[in-house]
Amino acid sequence: MMKMKTLLALAISGICAAGVANAHDHMAKPAGPSIEVKVQQLDPANGNKDVGTVTITESNYGLVFTPNLQGLAEGLHGFHIYENPSCEPKEKDGKLIAGLAAGGHWDSKGAKQHGYPWQDDAHLGDLPALTVLHDGTATNPVLAPRLKKLDEVRGHSIMIHAGGDNHSDHPAPLGGGGPRMACGVIK
């Protein structure tokens, strides 16, 4: 009888472990259509450098942005969808600005203010901040709950800023993320 209880306990433990592993696999890989965006670190003087990809996937909760990036500065970085499908530099006030051809934060609903990704009266292109670890990698996915379909973001670009994002226009405009650091065109 003791052997039977032990076998039963082991069987239940195995089933539970398999269920947890299966749930983890589903959490780690959102189901649904996806596109992969090539991302480059912006350097107008010496040429852009590949730093990895961001995979955008449809989920029941919104679009999931899963970075697979390396070679970036550690810390939190502003992460946005920009208006134009370009990462080219453009001149402003006599200076060549990295990624300026991408335009501004994507704002198709005319909110005209920076905010949180779930905030209805903010730019649609406002995403959660991107976390870069001490080794220069970024792999933690972020969710954009107001964006539902890949077709919404095609024909725009992804922008990563040198600084963090306070999801407000105060004290600095557009979250205070500073210079455009890396970019990828969403095709």
Curated annotation (Swiss-Prot):
Its main location: periplasm. SUPFAM superfamilies: Cu,Zn superoxide dismutase-like (SSF49329). Cu cation binds at H80, H105, H161. Keywords: Copper, Disulfide bond, Metal-binding, Periplasm, Signal, Zinc. The record marks Y82 as: Ancestral copper-binding site. Zn(2+) binds at H105, H114, H123, D126. One of its GO terms (biological process) is superoxide metabolic process. It is found in: Periplasm. It comes from the Bacteria. The keyword Zinc applies. Pfam families: Sod_Cu (PF00080). Disulfide bonds join C87-C183. Its cofactor is Cu cation; Zn(2+). The keyword Zinc applies. Binds 1 copper ion per subunit. GO terms for molecular function: copper ion binding. Coiled coil: none annotated. Residues 1-23 form the signal peptide. One of its GO terms (cellular component) is periplasmic space. InterPro entries: SOD-like_Cu/Zn_dom_sf (IPR036423), SOD_Cu/Zn_/chaperone (IPR024134), SOD_Cu/Zn_BS (IPR018152), SOD_Cu_Zn_dom (IPR001424). Belongs to the Cu-Zn superoxide dismutase family. Homodimer. This protein lacks enzymatic activity (probably because of the presence of a tyrosine instead of a histidine at residue 82). This is Superoxide dismutase [Cu-Zn]-like.
